[in-house]
């Protein structure tokens, strides 16, 4: 009996990968590395503390992944500065797929938001996000990367991810080695997303705290009436509370991109949206649910 234990997985910038490659092989670790696309911007934005470029070393380390027994993949976060070089991004995806051990079907895009970029990078508008999404489909639909562009590349914006929860505090947790528990990598070190410490607090208190904090974070802004009228609310749940509060907004920052993806992937609009809105408000909102009957 007991729990099934999975193999370890690490997220890494791949800079010091060569130091750990034997351990990675020994313990069958799967790897998710981060790269900037287009690659020439990696050297601009990902430098060492001593201002040294890192791309050449990272591409060498990608080659070391060839012989690891478990999965390896990379992801790229796209800001406006990357979006402005969309054709270069396409070229570099093809380059990585053809010339490295990476299968670029197993790759994912994230859409950057300004919170963590120290003012260096800027977020794309919703129109630019949709243009980016459509350009990737135009280029890769029907190609040897069709599986990727219609699957993992944009999966983060589908309902399989964390934002599909009514309350993500009921399901997702980030544990630090000192025992501190936060919501996730976005909420890490932010007191509004701190749930407690496993050495000092009971499990019950941590779970209650998690649920309550996410509820409060969703309610910092009033419920968006566009969301109330949207038949995809059952999939989106108004988006990530952390990002909404970072932007001072009350709807998902990738709203239009999500709607494109829902249509392309055949998700049905909810014909009983009014009933869903009532149940959602009852569970997740401070607004009077009676107004939504």
PLM feature spans:
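Conserved SAM/AdoMet-binding glycine-rich loop
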Residues: 1-39
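Short linear motifs in exposed loops
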Residues: 184-185
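Radical SAM enzyme [4Fe-4S]-AdoMet core and its adjacent flexible, acidic
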Residues: 40-168, 174-178, 190-195
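Flexible mid-to-C-terminal extensions adjoining Fe-S/redox cofactors in radical SAM and related proteins
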Residues: 188-293
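Short, basic, glycine/proline-bearing loop/turn elements
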Residues: 6, 154, 210
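Short, small-residue-rich loop/turn micro-motifs
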Residues: 35-39, 113, 234
């Amino acid at each position: 009996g007991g729990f099934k234990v999975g193999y370890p997985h690490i997220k890494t910038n791949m800079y010091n990968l060569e130091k750990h490659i034997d351990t990675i092989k020994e313990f069958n670790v799967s790897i998710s590395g981060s790269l900037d696309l287009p690659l020439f911007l990696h050297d601009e934005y990902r430098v060492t503390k001593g201002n040294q470029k890192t791309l050449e070393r990272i591409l060498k380390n990608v080659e070391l992944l060839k012989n690891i027994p478990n999965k390896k993949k990379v992801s790229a976060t796209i800001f406006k500065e990357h979006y402005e070089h969309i054709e270069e991004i396409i070229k570099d995806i093809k380059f990585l797929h053809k010339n490295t051990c990476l299968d670029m079907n197993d790759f994912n895009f994230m859409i950057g938001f300004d919170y963590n970029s120290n003012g260096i990078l800027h977020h794309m508008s919703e129109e630019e996000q949709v243009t980016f999404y459509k350009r990737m489909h135009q280029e890769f639909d029907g190609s040897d990367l069709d599986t990727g562009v219609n699957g993992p590349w944009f999966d983060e914006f589908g309902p399989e991810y964390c934002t599909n929860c009514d309350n993500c505090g009921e399901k997702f947790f980030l544990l630090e080695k000192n025992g501190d528990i936060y919501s996730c990598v976005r909420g890490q070190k932010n007191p509004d997303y701190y749930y407690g410490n496993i050495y000092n607090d009971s499990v019950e208190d941590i779970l209650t705290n998690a649920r309550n904090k996410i509820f409060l974070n969703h309610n910092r802004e009033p419920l968006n009436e566009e969301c109330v009228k949207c038949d995809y609310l059952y999939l989106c749940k108004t988006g990530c509370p952390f990002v909404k509060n970072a932007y001072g907004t009350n709807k998902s920052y990738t709203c239009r991109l999500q709607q494109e993806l829902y249509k392309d992937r055949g998700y049905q609009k909810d014909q009983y949206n009014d009933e869903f809105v009532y149940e959602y408000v009852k569970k997740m909102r401070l607004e009077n649910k009676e107004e939504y009957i």
